[in-house]
Design a protein with these regions (language model features):
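Hydrophobic transmembrane alpha-helices and their immediate loop junctions
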Residues: 1-606
């Protein structure tokens, strides 16, 4: 891609050097600007109710100032946090994921590219249109208007005021003009989310059945032909209502074979699944893990293998496994014909300054397998969590655990006085790996999709979904939290307790939803409309926030300069221009450094 862009840029340079670029095309590095005079008369007409526009501009300027202060503090505090505690690089912190380009950004799939481009177009039009209208409201001449292109991709629009004419306008008029773009972006955001949260998502319900978001390779479900996008609507002839209902019904069936009914669009089929206990993940420090750091040459378990027996007794479901391990703190697992023996419990890592770290023989970073607390058997991480719910901080408990001692596992007990976390819950002071001794398994083989969670978040029900109801919140708080929740949807797997990102209703996940009510006549078009509103709001809000960063050439930088000039002009100094430049340059460089740290810091400092 870099080679292509470089070749494209040199080709443009050659055309410009030979005078072959039309006068309406400008160049700033690899950025092309297309200039036009068309549209000025329309802006003159739109700007006629000047009293209204000035009132709107004053309101927007106040909003912009608040957001500017907020973004300044947020960026500085985030940069300081990254320097003090460099985070591990994640997909979100990859530089390419800063770009709002579907297919380049890992979180923006090509399947919703039309809706994203529509949202970007609307955002650019209302933003630059706001600048244009306020230029005419404040009697500032417009030199030209147009689009900015990176190669052939539209990345911006612009209204170019006549600079001499702009400087003649009063500071208040200039500030309103610079704030107009972000004000319009925020107004569009409110409008589209009101439509999305109201009539649009009010017409979308979750279809009955369990939503299959994925199937593990080599799993029982995969072998039976279950695919992503399927809905499991019945098990052994009994209807399935949702994901939780499927898990309950499967757990209640003792036989290895289950017959499931699957729907996908207009297709309905039945298939029989022979369950087998597939290892879907294993923590590296597990006593059963391949490549065990303790240096053992014993056989080990890897992801994708099947656990077929515990101490010679056949197992094929998670329920079987838990039952066979309930009375065995050390067990022998049969995997692909090989037998591996180890302690069974909740795999844990001792945390710095936690209660258990002060126990004899333990220090931060040590690995142990907790098998019992006060005599209560712990088979897996879920058992540990439910057992700890019965204790309070300050109580002393006896923790039974196994630690590695050379080539063998040593059983030890520790008396631990429990501490509390930020939520007031009792803690031992450990980081717990999921599963049994760090082994995660699936007897069925599907990864279920949180269709109801995503539907509720798209409807603005953030507090209902994650806040325990939220009934006491006012409508404004509920709306703002709903907007905040939708902003996180493209990164949901990293920011919420769900295993998927949500970029909108795409071909494979629309099978999980149904349309009802007066808008049902739109059919699948309602999903497209919901996507368009979602991405229009998402992009406009981010566009508004970004342009409020107090740094040139963003609108926030211009507003900062106007404000600085107004304050400095009242000070007893003859060097007002230099002081203003010092303020804006210092703030601008601080913002640039903060942004660079946010983008590249995790890769450079981790």
């Amino acid at each position: 891609m870099v080679i292509g862009i470089t070749a494209y840029w040199f080709a443009l340079l050659g055309l410009r050097a030979n005078g072959m670029l039309p006068s309406y095309i400008g160049m700033q590095g690899p950025i092309l600007t297309l200039h036009t005079q068309k549209g000025k008369k329309l802006l003159d007409k739109l700007s006629r109710p000047k009293r209204f526009w000035r009132a709107w501009g004053n309101f927007g300027l106040g909003i912009a100032l608040v957001v500017m202060i907020g973004t300044f503090l947020l960026l500085v505090l985030q940069a300081v946090s990254i320097i003090q505690n460099p985070p591990e690089p994640t997909a979100v912190t990859q530089p390419r994921n800063v770009l709002v380009i579907p297919g380049v950004n890992d979180f923006l799939p090509l399947s919703v590219a039309p809706e994203i481009l529509l949202g970007l177009l609307i955002g650019l039009v209302v933003h630059e249109g706001g600048h244009g209208i306020f230029c005419r409201v404040e009697d500032i001449e417009i030199k030209s208007m147009g689009l900015a292109l990176f190669a052939i991709l539209p990345i911006g629009a612009f209204v170019e005021p006549d600079e001499e004419n702009r400087r003649e306008a009063d500071r208040g008029g200039q500030s309103r003009m610079f704030a107009a773009g972000v004000t319009n972006n925020f107004a569009v955001t409110i409008l589209v989310f009101m439509l999305l949260f109201g009539p649009i998502m009010g017409s979308v319900t979750v279809a009955s059945g369990a939503a299959v978001g994925g199937v593990f390779d080599g799993s029982a479900a995969g072998d039976a032909g279950i695919e992503r996008g399927d809905r499991i609507v019945a098990v052994n002839g009994t209807d399935v209502e949702n994901n939780a209902d499927l898990n309950q019904k499967l757990a209640a069936i003792d036989s290895r074979s289950v017959t499931v009914t699957v729907e996908n669009g207009d297709e309905r089929r039945q298939t029989t699944i022979e369950r087998s206990l597939l290892v879907t993940a294993i923590t590296q420090t597990s006593p059963f893990a391949a490549g065990d750091e303790q240096g053992s040459d014993e056989p080990a378990i890897s992801t994708g293998e099947n656990i077929t027996a515990v101490n010679g007794t056949t197992v094929y479901t998670e329920k079987n496994l838990s039952q066979q391990l309930a009375d065995r703190k050390v067990a022998t697992l049969t995997v692909n014909g090989e037998q591996i023996t180890g302690p069974i419990g909740a795999l844990s890592t001792v945390q710095q300054d936690g209660p258990v770290s002060s126990a004899d023989g333990l220090s931060a970073g040590d690995t142990l397998v907790i098998t019992a607390i006060d005599g209560n058997r712990i088979v897996n991480s879920s058992d540990l969590s439910s057992t700890m719910d019965g204790y309070e901080a300050g109580q002393t408990v006896t923790v039974e655990a196994y630690t590695q001692d050379g080539d063998s596992d040593q059983r030890t007990t520790y008396d631990v006085t429990l501490d509390e976390n930020n939520s007031g819950e009792a803690i031992v002071g450990i980081l717990v790996a999921p599963g049994t001794s760090g082994i995660e398994t699936s007897g069925f083989g599907t990864n279920l999709y949180p269709a109801e969670t995503f539907r509720d978040l798209m409807a603005g029900q953030f507090m209902t979904t994650f806040g325990g109801g939220g009934g006491g919140d006012g409508p404004l708080t509920t709306f703002l939290l709903g907007v905040a929740g939708t902003l996180l949807l493209p990164f949901a797997s990293l920011s919420m307790p769900v295993g998927y990102n949500f970029a909108g209703f795409v071909a494979w996940n629309t099978n999980f939803y149904a349309i009802q009510g007066p808008l049902s006549g739109l059919g699948g078009g309602l999903f497209i409309l919901a996507n368009a509103l979602f991405w229009t709001g998402w992009i406009n809000l981010n566009l508004g926030f970004f342009n409020c960063i107090p740094a040139f050439p963003l609108d926030g930088g211009h507003i900062l300069r106007m404000g600085s000039e107004a304050i400095v002009s009242r000070l007893p100094t003859s060097q007002g221009r230099q002081v203003t430049t010092m303020i804006t340059t210092t703030v601008g460089l601080t913002m640039l450094a903060s942004l660079l740290l946010m983008i590249f810091g995790p890769q450079l400092l981790a």
